[in-house]
Structure formats: structure tokens, C-alpha cells
Amino acid sequence: MKTITVNGQPRDTAAHDIAALVAELGFVKGAVLVEHNGTALRPTEWPGRALNDGDTIELLRLAAGG
């Protein structure tokens, strides 16, 4: 278990990478933008991007409408 910061809030997680974290949080791939320690990531980068204790994640849910 590691402690990371997600959207400014501390959170304990067992996720080993960004893809696992996105799934753990219930987001749908393609419906969320992810920034990891200040770097914006493409969804193709999520599976290989390891999470470490103290990392900072910003998530932005995309919504369409009119």
C-alpha cells in the first residue's frame, strides 16, 4: 500500500501503475485526462507508468454536452 495525492487529497492505494489506479477509481479510459507528477500522460502510457509513494496525480473527467 502506498500513499499518493489525487486531485489534492491524500489517498492510499494498492495500484501499481496509472492504469490500475484509473480502474480502481472507476474512471473509463478515454473519459479522463491524467497528469502524473506534473506530466500529462496519454492513455497508452498508463500501463507502464509506475506509481510510487508520494506521487501526485491530477485527474480531469471529460464530459460532453450541449
Name each model-derived stretch.
Residues 1-65:
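Ubiquitin-like/PB1-type beta-grasp interaction modules and other compact soluble beta-rich domains
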